[in-house]
Amino acid sequence: MQFVPIKDAPGYLVNEAGDVFSTFTNKVLSRYIVDGYPAVKLQINGKQTSVLIHRIISHVFGDLYNLFDPELEVDHKDRDRLNLSKDNLQVLSKIEHQRKTNKDNGWSDSRVPCPLCGSLMLQRSVTCTNCKPKPTGRLIKPELSLDDITEKVLLMGWVKAAKELEVSESTLRRRYTKLTGLSPKVLTEQRKSK
């Protein structure tokens, strides 16, 4: 079988059987299984990335335009995760794929798209977990200012300053980061340089 370049993975080629060839090592890459799906490790932009082989086949020989598109999923028509035939693969949105999976497994389709982002959520929910407002929590000692923190830490260090201001050291460091956008290490370095 003829190897064809993988558009979104320069230096790699694939054939219709799902063998992935590296031009860096001049070898066919070893496969391993991730959640029942055959996968390979590719070096993309200097980082090692696990890529499912059925996504590569669908990208090169099918309808998956972008190999790493998180909005599209590749479905095995016959539900056999090891069947990598390009005729057995189809590209679906997350919602379409969930509905097909529910139908294939005989489950009721109790999930609906979130009105804000479109990802699947339970029918009785108002929004999905991603769009649900996160609790803000209670701010400990809201009157604690950046000047108070800076003055005390430069004078006595984080531990003693926290004790003096009656908060934990981690609370003091988090408050400093929240107020300045800087790491607490910046203030520690300033103290050392005095």
Curated annotation (Swiss-Prot):
One of its GO terms (molecular function) is endonuclease activity. InterPro entries: His-Me_finger_sf, HNH_nuc. Keywords: DNA-binding, Early protein, Endonuclease, Hydrolase, Nuclease. It comes from the Viruses. Transmembrane segments: none annotated. The keyword Hydrolase applies. SUPFAM superfamilies: His-Me finger endonucleases. Induction: Expressed in the early phase of the viral replicative cycle. Signal peptide: none annotated. Pfam families: HNH_3. Its EC number is 3.1.21.-. The keyword Hydrolase applies. Endonuclease that cleaves only one strand of asymmetric DNA substrates thereby introducing interruptions into the template or coding strand. This is H-N-H endonuclease F-TflI. It comes from Escherichia phage T5 (Enterobacteria phage T5). The lineage of its organism: Viruses, Duplodnaviria, Heunggongvirae, Uroviricota, Caudoviricetes.
